[in-house]
Amino acid sequence: AIRRILTGSPITKSPLDLYTQCAFLNPQLLGFTSYLAFRNRYAEMGEIPVGSNRWISIPKYYKNLEELEQKLKQFSSRIRKDQCLDLKPKIRQKRYIQLEGKAKKIYEKLRINALAIVEDSTISFSNKLTEIVKLHQVCNGFTKDDDGQMLKLHDQKIEALKEILDETDGKVIIWANYLWNIHEIIFFLKTKYGEQSTVSIFGEVNVKDRKTAVERFQNDKEVKFLVGNPSTGGFGLTLTACTTVIYYSNSYNYEVRLQSEDRAHRMGQKGSVVYIDI
């Protein structure tokens, strides 16, 4: 039997992810009889707290990666998209906004608190990450009060989106990381451009309706906008009907970003795709 692996993107999270793929091809390829031995060769592990009296092991840093690369070259090949497709280069732009008033005061208060928590070695990694997410939410126009209720702080990103769309011709993809923002964007677009102007792909949309949304975005002239969460709609879809992609908000996942960019920048795209980060 012949075994092969085909992947659309390189390993983006950790070199350690290679072990199971190579073991599937042939357990002898990398020269290790166990994952533990492989991990010890290519990663220095450390422990972080994740709760009361609970710790998990994570890589502190990777090592001997040139050796691993040489081993991979013996049985793998890589062809980049620009080597097999005639696509125009991606164009990138950024639109900056400044926090003002109440939002700025809340951000500064959260920032000071977050710095204290991040520097405290006794506090778990998940709690530290929560503080960073709170800052990110304020930048995206909302926060949660002490009762867990969502509070709107500003419209600056929506205003920036309005300006961009006023300058843009053709269809547009708008990616947003938070459900709050997705609903806000959809409401704005349907109010200004009409109920049929916008389709969406995110967690609340069922699989059948997601497929319909893609088909309408690609083929229906009445549909101008696709609003989605890149973690939900950013993989495997063809959305080449547009040449403008707006990132209203981002996550911290690089793989999600790359994959969502390539929904428009793929086979069938004739124009130059512009990516705008707010």
Language-model segment annotations:
Residues 1, 5-6, 31-170:
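Inter-lobe coupling linker of SF2 helicases/translocases
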Residues 1-36, 84-111, 224, 228-278:
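SF2 helicase/translocase ATPase core recognition
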Residues 149-151, 202-205, 250-252:
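Short, contiguous acidic/charged loop-to-helix segments that flank catalytic cores in large enzymes
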Residues 79, 136, 157, 210, ...:
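Short, cationic motifs built from Arg/Lys/His that form the positively charged side of catalytic pockets
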Residues 7, 139, 176, 202, ...:
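Short beta-strand/turn micro-motifs composed of small residues
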Residues 1, 70, 74, 96, ...:
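Helicase-associated low-complexity regulatory tails and linkers flanking the ATPase motor
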Residues 154, 177-180:
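Helix N-cap/beta->alpha junction signal
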